[in-house]
Curated annotation (Swiss-Prot):
The keyword Nucleotide-binding applies. This is Transcription activator GutR. ATP binds at residues 200-207. One of its GO terms (molecular function) is DNA binding.
Length: 829
């Protein structure tokens, strides 16, 4: 029994760990409709430990200080500790601090062997239905996580330090005014208050001041507080999904492997990563335009760990949403610039227009604006309510309008517009002065998930390069858009009020919207064609087998995905089919669940249009192959057989080839299921069939798998080598399966140099390999090292593979093999 020497301290240390489990998907409570009570997360933990829920509540002080026990059974205590350390990001310091409140001996600084010995005492309900200690492999995984960053411990190749910040570029060269508001933000950063909300009308500069405050923390650490990381998330472009929100945070914290995970897993991991990184210094999380974001984002913010400071901007006042959760929060209501700052902003904006203008008449009008009387400037500032965006739009309008500036200022003053009416007036007058091409650009801005570049925006609007640049120059001169140079190309950023006004006009132009969306979609079809299509093989589907440089596709992926989603939602079947045909193989390295989802939708679309061969491709390879990769063998078999049935009625050129591949895939599926005889029967039936090199390559790989499964390793090597030689006739594939299986076969034959060479063939760029490549590489090297007798290195390499599997796709088919090797290395120690 463990005696609790300091019961209060023990409860205070244990409680946060237990409560953190409440958010974990394994313990999250799901009550049925109209059900008054249900199993709580503590009930689930209690079941796993074999104690009552009240026992756990007493341990964490939830029933009062008098009910905290004086002693706890070692197995139960370490069982509780095991669950917390396995499911959360709590570190070794938490464990030592907790145990110091007991009579259990503590080694400081902690050592891996000591931590492992503690966890071996845990008694939990295991998967086999018996109470006992976790497996050796499970304990080793947790211990490696606890000590991964200690000197002498090799770190995971994919573990990254948090990026300092991801702030966008400043919109203006010099920030003017707002000294009182800036000081209020600085004081909030230094205070215990977790949330600061900046509200104000559109165009007041909420984004600008939030950005300036963030840059102040980066540039001037002597006055502004230092943060471990500053994370900027913007909902400005067409709203912000919860998944995008979590992805951004995960990426900035060096957890990019979480990007393709389920929402529940990602939510839990991201929250714990935030807690982990805030132990030394706080993190500043800035969410721009929070009022347009999904409700889940609001809920996530209200449960952030201590040490995360959240700066929000919103047009609407959402104070009540957060006040109920935080009690104390800082709220800053931005009003217009004061007279002095507004005068300075006026001068700066006019000078900026002069620098970008080379038209004599327009320059003359701008010069006149510089010399307006103070009274006229004051009248102008009053009419625009000191709103920076309204002032910029007005200056751009006055410099181009035939009406004298003085007259327009008087008209604005007399009209007494509200700010909303003023924007309508300014956008309306600006719209009237825009030429047709500029209006086209303006209306198509709303198509994009991320700011477009010249080619995509021009294509959507239907403009050639000359007309695009003329229209873009007009948009710039009217202060509607801001070019930003990033990653070697120019993107065009627009304020959300500008995008919304263009979308409003687009909704009234049904014919133009139809044409523009069609151009937009076909631009991205052509984009995928350009960046994915190979010269060989010549096929409607196999031509898009992956090359190796996917940077261009990844840059535009958010916008491509938006086209796919639009095509699916609006039943643009032809467009969906063309896109999925091109990106199916790309999705195998980006997101297998998306490949499955849209592969099925594309198959349904092809079925509706009578495109039988395309439907078969989508069912057999796009969906069937991917389902097999995530170990859904029943789902894979269903799709493959549906595709084969379709091909019975097709005499298309590709149909025979695809039919052979469908049968070979079935054989591969039976091999995965341990049914070697069924697999062999199918392979014998399709033997010596006249097929293309692309399919021949794949069939030989499956034949190699059968030989390998039967222990005929030399024969397997011959088949794998033959498959790779055939693929070289059409440019090669360098598929992971081909080189991984070849490498393992060489390991079995003790040809270690050739094995290592084969494994390295999977990594096109060793320094920038993706997760799935690294999973197979580390597992292959683990087998090689184990065969050579280098047991310690083998275990380390295998653990890397397991960690990558957990973070990329836990259901990936190879997982069982990797775990079997982990058990084998333990048994032979």
């Amino acid at each position: 029994m463990a005696e609790l020497e300091n019961r209060k301290q023990f409860a205070q240390m244990l409680a946060p760990g237990v409560k953190t489990l409440k958010l974990h998907p394994d313990y999250k409570v799901r009550r049925k409709k109209n059900e008054k009570t249900g199993q709580s997360y503590i009930d689930k933990i209690a079941l796993q430990l074999g104690v009552s829920p009240n026992t756990i509540k007493s341990w964490i002080g939830q029933m009062g200080a008098n009910y905290i026990p004086g002693r706890i059974d070692d197995g139960k205590l370490f069982g509780m500790i095991w669950i917390i350390l396995e499911k959360t990001d709590l570190d070794i310091e938490w464990l030592t601090d907790l145990l110091e409140a007991t009579t259990i001996p503590v080694i400081k600084p902690a050592l891996p062997v000591w931590a492992a010995s503690c966890l071996k005492k845990a008694k939990i309900l295991r998967k086999d239905g018996l109470f006992g200690a976790p497996s050796e492999g499970e304990i080793e995984n947790v211990v490696k996580r606890l000590f991964h960053d200690r000197p002498g411990q090799e770190t995971n190749a994919l573990t990254e330090q948090p990026i300092t910040h991801n702030l966008p570029s400043r919109w203006s060269g010099r920030f003017i005014g707002r000294s009182f508001d800036m000081e209020a933000i600085r004081q909030w950063m230094l205070s215990p208050s977790p949330v600061c909300l900046i509200t104000g009308w559109a165009g007041m500069g909420k984004t600008t001041i939030a950005l300036e405050a963030a840059y102040s923390c980066v540039d001037d650490t002597s006055v502004w507080p230092a943060f471990n990381s500053i994370i900027w998330v913007s909902a400005d472009w067409k709203g912000l999904s919860f998944s995008d929100f979590l992805n951004t945070i995960a990426y900035q914290l060096g957890r990019k492997e979480q990007i393709d995970k389920s929402i529940n897993v990602k939510r839990f991991v991201v929250r714990n990563a935030l807690a982990n990184y805030t132990r030394e210094k706080p993190i500043l999380l800035i969410v721009d335009s929070i009022d347009t974001a999904e409700r889940d984002i609001h809920e996530f913010i209200t449960s952030l760990p201590q040490g995360v400071k959240v700066l929000l901007t919103a047009r609407e006042n959402v104070k009540q949403t957060y006040r109920e959760s935080f009690g104390e929060m800082t709220a800053i209501q931005l009003s217009g610039l004061d007279q002095t700052d507004a005068h300075e902003f006026f001068q700066q904006e006019v000078h900026h227009c002069l620098q970008t203008c080379n038209l004599p008449r327009k320059r003359e009008k701008l010069e006149q604006l510089l010399h307006l009387s103070s009274d006229l400037k004051n009248e102008f500032i009053s009419a625009t309510a000191g709103n920076p965006k309204a002032m910029a739009l007005s200056i751009a309008y006055m410099s181009d309008d035939d009406i004298p500036a003085q007259q327009l200022i008087h008209e604005l003053g007399k009209a007494g517009y509200s700010l909303l009416e003023l924007f309508e007036f300014l956008f309306g007058r600006t719209w009237d002065r825009c030429n047709e091409d500029t209006r086209k650009l303006w209306q198509t801005l709303c198509f994009f998930s991320k700011p477009p570049d010249e080619k995509s925006l021009a294509a959507a609007a239907g403009l050639d390069a000359r007309r695009f640049h003329y229209a873009m120059e007009q948009m710039r001169s009217y202060a509607l858009i801001q070019p930003e140079r990033s990653q070697g190309r120019t993107q065009y950023l627009a304020h959300q009020t500008v995008v919304a006004y263009g979308e409003q006009h687009l909704s009234e132009q049904h014919e133009y919207e139809k044409e523009a969306r069609n151009r937009w979609a076909h631009y991205y079809i052509d984009y995928a064609e350009t960046h994915l299509k190979r010269e060989q093989p010549n096929s409607i589907y196999w031509s898009y087998l992956l090359g190796r440089n996917l940077d261009q596709m990844k840059q535009e992926w958010p916008n491509i995905l938006k086209v796919i989603q639009w095509a699916s939602e609006t039943e643009q079947k032809e467009i969906l089919i063309e896109l999925i045909t091109r990106i199916s193989h790309f999705l195998s390295r980006i997101n297998l669940p998306l490949r499955i989802e849209y592969g099925r939708k594309a198959a349904d679309a092809a079925h509706h249009l009578g495109q039988h061969t395309r439907e078969a491709y989508f069912r057999i390879d796009t969906s069937g192959w991917a389902l097999m990769e995530v170990n859904d063998l029943d789902g894979a078999l269903q799709q493959i057989e549906a595709g084969l049935k379709i091909l019975e009625q097709s005499d298309a050129h590709d149909a025979y080839d695809l039919k052979v591949w469908g049968h070979a895939l079935k054989a591969r599926l039976f091999l995965k299921d341990g049914q070697q005889e069924k697999a062999e029967t199918i392979l014998n039936e399709i033997e010596n069939q006249p097929i293309s090199p692309t399919i021949q390559h794949r069939v030989l790989l499956v034949r190699g798998d059968l030989s390998f499964a039967r222990g005929y390793h030399v024969e397997a090597i011959q088949l794998y080598e033959a498959a790779n030689e055939i693929s070289s006739t059409y440019g090669g594939e360098k598929t992971i399966e081909a080189y991984f299986n070849l490498g393992v076969a060489y390991v079995k034959c003790d040809q270690f140099e050739k094995a290592e060479e084969a494994f390295e063939q999977m990594l096109y760029d060793k320094h920038n390999a993706n997760q799935v490549e690294l999973i197979y590489y580390h597992y292959g090297m683990a087998q090689l090292l184990y065969r050579k007798g280098e047991k310690t290195k083998a275990v380390e390499s295998n653990q890397k593979a397991i960690r990558l599997i957990d973070s990329w796709e836990p259901a990936i088919g190879i997982r069982g093999e990797v775990e079997r090797l982990a058990r084998a290395t333990k048994e032979n120690e």
